[in-house]
Amino acid sequence: IPYLDFARSGDHKVVWELNRHQHLVLLAQAWLLTSDDRYLEEIVRHMESWWEQNPYQHGINWASALEVAFRALSWIWVYHWTGHRMEPDFRRRFLEELYRHGLHLEFNLSIHFSPNTHLLGEAVALHALGVLFPGWPRSSRWRRLGRGLVLDQMDSQVLADGFHFERSPYYHLYATDMFVF
């Protein structure tokens, strides 16, 4: 399926937006505020369904490293708030899938395709995975690589006047959010 061909497949960004899993962050926050396990059950249901329908590196949800990065960042928040309440088998699978996101990012960085805001988001996610999961085999590499890329992007994307080089308020806000993260 030529999923990046708008004329043949429609707007792939609609699919990507849903698959950033920002709604799972909201479910995790709802659980954190209420302790209502229905929110956790819904997270598990969504995650298991997603894993089944989106095997590692197959399909539209693996076509953009930036989208993989956004999803990884969402999953990090979900894990941070709910990981201690996950069943052991689900938790193990969750961490395996999150690790795969890191592998995908490491080997598919947008260095040549879109080495600006895309690369920045990917680098932030890679760095976060390296810092927050220090026991993983590639953590130290991800931490160093991600941090180095973030610092490089800070130098190349921020002008002397402090504004983002694309002169877009949206990209300025996006880059600032990523640098702060």
Task: Explain the meaning of each model-derived region.
Residues 4, 9-181:
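Aromatic-lined, polymer-binding surfaces characteristic
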